[in-house]
Amino acid sequence: MHFTLYSRSYCHLCQDMLDALLLLQPPDKLFTVEVIDIDTSPDTSLLARFDELVPVLFGDLAQPELCHYFLDEAAVRRCLP
């Protein structure tokens, strides 16, 4: 499983969400997390899309977001195999 977390470097909620997400990782089923800083990303559309919503977590970029601001543990667990 792969998660994408849209974030900002100075955002304490972003770090909190990442920390909480990593705590959900089962030892036998590892997942990856790509953290994308919307302020430094070459994709300038991310800033317009996620500016006031960060942190925003996706499990599959083709699907709606899993959560923003705070980790939705139930939504994340539904994504895990």
Language model segments and positions:
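Generic recognition of short, well-ordered alpha-helical segments
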Residues: 16-19, 45-49, 71
